[in-house]
């Protein structure tokens, strides 16, 4: 049972990273559907850097930078050229999928040494929960820390208030003297950096190898998590653990030979994602609460 819970916790980490970053981008009014592509670029960059330098911490840095740079491509078109955000995000996912496959081709079949666990003294000795909560890699701790910082930033700081104002009414924010495009560029860049970290976690912790498309739809699940969380950071943790548990059920079912077709088991995380979105959509009041009023709307700065 302990091993199962540990696996659920680890599986939720990349979702926490990616969903937290996307939440910040969406609270600024930008809908970036390219999370999957950014995660793939983060994954391949992390694996390549770790293979070349022999240091997984270089892989973390490379993954974060790759995600941020991929997000900058999105910003160039969606913010700089005012292209449709949905179409641009989908194009970014296709771009990231293709480029990551090309960059990762020489590394197929290789393995790397993953991140070591960092046990927290004294806390790890707590009965039952000590090993479950206080004996993880640095990125697992970082994901929780970033989630808490984002919640504090959005609700307790002036900069967070400005970001939310830009997402709720970019015209009013501009009239008050705020630089809408700069705020959104920063939010999208942060979202890309987080997606890159989420992607980097896959080859550095979960599976110490590179394979094309190894994110396996986690970027889309992260997008659904933001809606599930109603754009509230603390709820992302609950959603990530829920979807992580469903993913582990799928893998456990395949390993134990449940009398269910493997294709049906593989569908479980994505069917759950669709069902959650359908339930939320039917409850219109819940679906709209905390939703940024200008989400996905193009902003053209008046001269």
Language-model features: locations:
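Membrane-interfacial amphipathic/re-entrant helices at transmembrane-helix boundaries
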Residues: 1-18, 31, 45, 52-58
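Hydrophobic core segments of alpha-helical transmembrane domains in multi-pass membrane transport
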Residues: 18-19, 43-47, 97-98, 142-152, ...
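Alpha-helical transmembrane segments within multi-pass membrane transporters and channels
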Residues: 54-99, 242, 247
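Loop-to-transmembrane alpha-helix initiation sites
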Residues: 85-87, 113-118, 135-142, 184, ...
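Transmembrane helix-bundle core of multi-pass membrane transporters
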Residues: 97-156, 256-265, 292-303
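Helix-loop-helix "hairpin" substructures at the membrane interface of multi-pass membrane proteins
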Residues: 132-210, 233-238
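Cytosolic-side transmembrane-helix boundaries in multi-pass membrane proteins
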Residues: 150, 168-182, 253-303
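Transmembrane alpha-helical segments in multi-pass inner-membrane proteins
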Residues: 206-270
């Amino acid at each position: 049972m302990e091993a199962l819970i540990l696996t659920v916790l680890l599986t939720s980490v990349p979702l926490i990273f990616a969903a937290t970053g996307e939440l910040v981008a969406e609270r600024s009014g930008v809908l970036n559907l390219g999370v999957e592509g950014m995660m793939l670029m983060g994954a391949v960059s992390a694996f390549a850097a770790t293979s070349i330098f022999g240091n997984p911490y270089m892989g973390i840095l490379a993954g974060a930078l790759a995600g941020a740079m991929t997000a900058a491509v999105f910003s160039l078109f969606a913010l700089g050229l005012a292209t449709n955000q949905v179409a641009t995000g989908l194009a970014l996912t296709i771009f990231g999928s293709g480029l990551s496959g090309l960059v990762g081709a020489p590394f197929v079949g290789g393995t790397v040494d993953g991140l070591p666990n960092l046990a927290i003294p004294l806390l790890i000795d707590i009965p039952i929960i000590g090993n479950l909560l206080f004996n993880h890699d640095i990125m697992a701790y970082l994901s929780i820390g970033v989630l808490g910082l984002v919640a504090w930033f959005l609700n307790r700081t002036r900069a967070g208030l400005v970001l939310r104002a830009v997402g709720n009414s970019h015209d009013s924010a501009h009239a008050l003297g705020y630089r809408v495009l700069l705020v959104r560029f920063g939010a999208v860049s942060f979202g890309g950096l987080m997606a890159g970290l989420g992607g980097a976690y896959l080859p550095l912790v979960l599976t110490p190898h590179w394979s094309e498309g190894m994110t396996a739809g986690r970027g889309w699940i992260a997008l659904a998590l933001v809606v599930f969380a109603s754009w509230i950071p603390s709820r992302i943790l609950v959603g990530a653990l829920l979807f992580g548990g469903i993913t582990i059920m799928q893998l456990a079912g395949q390993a134990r030979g449940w009398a269910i077709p493997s294709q049906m088991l593989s569908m479980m995380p994505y069917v759950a994602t669709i069902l959650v979105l359908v339930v939320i959509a039917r409850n219109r009041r819940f679906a709209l609460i905390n939703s940024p009023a200008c989400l996905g709307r193009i902003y053209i700065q008046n001269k």
